[in-house]
Amino acid sequence: ESAVNYRLSFKANSPLVSQDGYIVYNLPETEQGIKSWEMSRLNTDRKSTLEIPYLITETYDYLLSIEPGIEFKSNPVEIKKQNKIGSVNIRIRQINNTIQVHKEIQLSKNTITPAEYGDFRALLTEWQNPLGQKLIFKKNDINK
């Protein structure tokens, strides 16, 4: 087997959704990664072996600059989980006017037994946690 590496770079001016005075930014992710496996809903237990398509390390690093008048409203996130199936690391923090986001999941087994399924599910549940997928901002009224 050979590894495939993708490097994605983009610049976006306004992929934002405004809701009730708040701005929601959905962090982009590749359609070729775990998202392509369509495993957004996982049962709590499993009676048969699960085969995932391939071993994967999926990593995203984002740096977002905030303009004056925009306030970052999301809480900082620090998620670290490791088990015999792999690991998940998600960190979101603000440093001055920059938001730093790091997301990484690594799966080291592609055949998951029913006994291991709970560990697999725990990793995917953290990876799909909405806290690590959306950033919330509020535009301040500077005319007050």
Stretches with model-predicted labels:
Residues 1-144:
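A sensor for short, sequence-defined functional sites
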